[in-house]
Structure formats: structure tokens, C-alpha cells
């Protein structure tokens, strides 16, 4: 990477990090582009070299932060050296991500408030930064290793994501209806049921 490319990356990283800090303290609606560039120490014109508006940088942050969560979960799965079934691998990843969010509640709040299926799907298939993962490739590999064909795999992951995001937010932040530790067993039963519902023909 040349000096020019390095400087561009430094400025982009500074804008992303500054925006994330402001979004998680002030909120997206109360943060202006001027706030971001002033705190990052760059000109407003520099902002528009990388992002269309503050919602573009918000979406890229959601993509990047989501990718980091999945990367950490996949690395933990690969390091576990456990022989897990397809269902168990999905639940391992979900459990790891829940634990990460439980330890970083500001990240949970940011993602939960700004995550839509469209943004999430884009996050998993279009890495924003060099260290982001392409979850689509990983998910396809997991599907290939499953003992049976998965009917409508995108619908299945959509159902799991919606279930986890809608139930864990209140449980982690407010212990409602119960704390996350008590909720997990019921959540994982539901995830198993979703996966089993999408199980098709057993592979030869």
C-alpha cells in the first residue's frame, strides 16, 4: 500500500471511528456531518470522498461492526475444535455473538436501532474493510456440509436474525422478560425448530 493509499485509509478509519463514537453517545439523529468532521479533524469535503451522507456512514458502520461480530464468532468456532452438527454450529455462532453484545451494550444499542434486513444482508456479502469477512461464503460452506439440503436458506437465516435481534435487545439491556442467561435455552430451542423446519432431503 502506497503512502497516498495509507493516508486515505487513515482518514476513512478516523471518520468511521469518530462517527461510531458520536452515534453511540449522541445518537444518529443528533449527530451532524459537521460534528463528525470537526471531531475527526478533517475537512467536510474529505467526508464526501468516502460517504454520501451520514446515513451512508451509519450503514457502513453497521456493516463493519456486524462483520466484526461474525468474524469473532467464526474464529471462536474454528478454534473450538469441537465436532458439532449443523444446528450446533449455527447456535454456537449465535451464542458467541450474543455474548459479545452482552459485553458491549453500546454496540448492541447502535446495531439494534439501525439494523434492517437490507443493511444486514449487504453487511454479510459486501465487506467494507479488508479485515471484514464475507459471511455469504462461510454460510454457503456450512450449508454444503449440512447432512441435508436446506430449503430457502436465506429465509432461514432471516428468521434466525429477526428472532435473535428482537428478543435479545430487551433481555440484555433490561432483563425483560428475563435475563439473557435464562432466555438462551428457550431461544436455542426456537432456533433448532427453525432449522429443522427448513431441513429438506437428506444428502446421499
PLM regions and their residue ranges:
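Hydrophobic/aromatic-rich alpha-helical bundle segments in the mid-to-C-terminal region
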Residues: 144-190, 202-204
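Helix-turn-helix
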Residues: 14, 22-56, 60
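Amphipathic alpha-helical packing segments from all-alpha helical-bundle domains
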Residues: 74, 119-147, 154-158, 185
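Alpha-helical DNA-contacting segments of helix-turn-helix folds
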Residues: 58-68, 72, 111, 131
